Regions:
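ABC-family P-loop ATPase nucleotide-binding domain
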Residues: 1-12, 220-228
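ABC family nucleotide-binding domain
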Residues: 4-214
Length: 228
């Protein structure tokens, strides 16, 4: 039965004269892994930033897990992001000199958990991502694939409703990329986390349940709406 966790309706967004989004309707089902594909500059990041409440569309609405993000102030949206959304980027989100455990524990400490509880959770997530024996190493001394697993653990440790992953394996070779995507998909399937995955790469998109294609600020193709 359909159980949407994100419902976006009529999204438009311009930056000066550039119309980045020109009227997008999109529904993401709870527990679904959705790939967002499209050429460079087509509007993928702008769409995902609107879906995650990072920016507000010029018109249209985004309801995420029952909350209308477009009715909230920037501060309220920031709170929703902290509590219900995880992010993984291509690189740059980890503190390279802290240990993997400290990196993953950080969002829990920011949410007010004790150091002891945060570390226990962090180590458990590192373990789930195959890094149980790397918990005391710093991402700066790890391979790119290992560091991305730490980033994924950090994004999931707060048990977000939705994980937004923007080219999460874009800086990895194909073997590491497949291994990291496989590990990520295993833990999100286990935890029932919804994933919105931006990618240029068809092999990466193949890990998703469904793909949508953004072209010139519009969704194109037959995959834009959930099959009946
Ligand atoms: N903050 C901004 N200021 C001005 N123009 C912007 C801004 N953000 C995006 N744009 C423009 O909006 C359009 C869509 O950009 P967007 O980053 O969403 O595309 P994309 O599909 O994610 O591209 P890429 O795959 O290269 O990351 C582009 O023409 C881009 O130059």
């Amino acid at each position: 039965m359909a159980d949407p966790i994100i419902t976006a309706t009529g999204l438009t967004k311009s930056f000066g004269p550039t119309q980045a989004l020109r009227g997008i309707d999109l529904t993401v089902e709870r527990g679904e892994v959705l790939a967002v594909m499209g050429p460079s500059g087509s509007g993928k990041s702008t769409l995902v930033h609107c879906l995650a409440g990072v920016i507000s569309p010029d018109s249209g609405s985004v309801v995420l897990d029952g909350t209308d993000l477009t009715a909230l102030s920037p501060d309220q949206r920031a709170k929703v992001r902290l509590q219900r959304i995880g992010f993984v980027f291509q690189f740059g989100q980890l503190l390279p000199d802290l240990t993997a455990t400290d990196n993953v524990a950080l969002p829990l400490l920011m949410a007010g958990r004790s150091r002891r509880a945060a570390n226990t959770q962090a180590i458990a997530w590192l373990d789930r991502l195959g890094l149980g024996d790397q918990a005391d190493k710093s991402p700066g001394s790890m391979s790119g694939g290992q560091a991305q697993r730490v980033a994924i653990a950090r994004a999931l440790v707060t048990r977000p409703a939705v994980l937004f992953a923007d080219e999460p394996t874009g800086s990895l070779d194909s073997v590491s990329s497949e291994s990291v995507l496989g590990a990520m998909l295993e833990v999100v399937r286990e935890s029932g986390t919804t994933v919105v995955l931006i990618t240029h790469d068809a092999r990466t998109a193949a890990y998703a349940d469904r793909e949508v294609i953004v072209r010139d600020g519009l969704l194109s193709g037959a995959y834009a709406s959930v099959p009946a």
